[in-house]
């Protein structure tokens, strides 16, 4: 090989390596991202079964039911729509009806029930994450304690 051919081979190998690295990083990020939805958005969104998402809203009053073992079912609402949720595990201490919650998981097998593997409750009675508050406000839900939105 001439010097020119060697140089082209090295440059071509470097470009191929960088392309492969960028594709691997993009694939890893796409697998780690969980988009945020409120129940009213899910009706418009095309979320494929098995796709990980974060579902945020309020725990509907009277919807919390304890099943066998550590399985809990409850309903998340934004006052415009509701989504039934199933969670197996220990709920946060601040989890209760009427409080804000963010559940992370997926819809499994085309079922309308959201299967959560992580449930987060807001840390006091007035705090609400800004993205949850913005989504609820966009759908016309009035919020008390707006000075506590962070």
Curated annotation (Swiss-Prot):
In this chain, heme is annotated as bound at 123, 127
Source organism, top-level taxon: Bacteria
The job of this chain, per UniProt, is described as: Heme chaperone required for the biogenesis of c-type cytochromes. Transiently binds heme delivered by CcmC and transfers the heme to apo-cytochromes in a process facilitated by CcmF and CcmH.
Membrane topology per record:
Single-pass type II membrane protein
**Which family would the database say this protein is a member of?**
Belongs to the CcmE/CycJ family.
Listed SUPFAM superfamilies? Heme chaperone CcmE (SSF82093)
**Which UniProt keywords are present, listed alphabetically?**
Cell inner membrane, Cell membrane, Cytochrome c-type biogenesis, Heme, Iron, Membrane, Metal-binding, Signal-anchor, Transmembrane, Transmembrane helix
Where is this gene product found? Cell inner membrane
Chief subcellular location: membrane
Gene3D superfamilies in UniProt: Nucleic acid-binding proteins
For the Cytoplasmic compartment, the record's topological domain ranges are 1-7
Species the sequence originates in = Rhizobium meliloti (strain 1021) (Ensifer meliloti)
Q: Which HAMAP family match?
A: CcmE (MF_01959)
Which cellular component, as a GO term, is one annotated location?
Answer: plasma membrane
- Periplasmic compartment ranges equal 29-150
Q: Which InterPro entries match?
A: CcmE, CcmE-like_sf, NA-bd_OB-fold
Q: What is the recorded name of this protein?
A: Cytochrome c-type biogenesis protein CcmE
User: What would be one Pfam family of this protein?
Assistant: CcmE
